[in-house]
Amino acid sequence: MTDWSRGSWTREPAAVALDAEGSLVVEAVEGSDWWRDTAYGFRHEDGHGLLAPWAPGAAVEVTFALEGFTGEFDQAGLVIVVDDATWIKAGVEQSDGHPQLGAVVTVGASDWSTGRVDDWTGRAVTVRASRIADAVVIRARSRPLDADAAASGEGDDWRLVRVARFPHEDARIGPMLCGPTRAGFRVRFLDWRETAPDGELHAPPPA
C-alpha cells in the first residue's frame, strides 16, 4: 500500500481522505494553479503538490484515475519543484473541451506542450519522471481502472511526453492537482512510488 504520509503539501487541499482501497482522494481549492508569466501575463504559485525529496538514482511514478475532469484546466499528475521559479508539472489537464496530456516546464517563465488523450478518459493514468544525464524525461501511459484487467498487464505502452534540461540534484517530487476555475474538483490518486530509473532515452523504462 502506498505511504502517502512521506510527503508534505505545498498548499493544503480543500479535503483529503483515504478510501477503502488505500487511494488518496484529494479535493482542490478553487483557483489553485501553477503558472509563471508566459502568454497569460499572470503568476500562480499555489497548486497542490504532495512532495518528498527526489533521490537522484530513482524514477518516480504517480498514478491517478482520469475521471471527473469537467472544468476548464482541471489537472492532475506529478510536479517537480526546485524553487518558486524552477519547476515542472506533467499530467492530464482538461483544456478546450478535451483531456490533454502535457507538461509545463518553468525556468523563470513557463512553457506548455500538450496533446489530446480523449481515449484515456475513465482509465488509470501513470506519469513518470526519470533523470538521464542533465535532463529529466517525462513519460505517461494509461491502463484500465478495473482491477482484474490491470492485474493482467493490459495497458498502453509508455509515451514520451517531454525531455527537459534538469541539472538540479536537489528537488522535491510527488502527486499534483489544481482546480483553477472551479470548486469541487477531486482526484483519486491510486499510487505514488519510486522505481528503477530509465536506462536510456529511446528505450522503454524498466518493467
Protein language model features and the residues they cover:
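Extracellular glycan-recognition regions
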Residues: 1-207
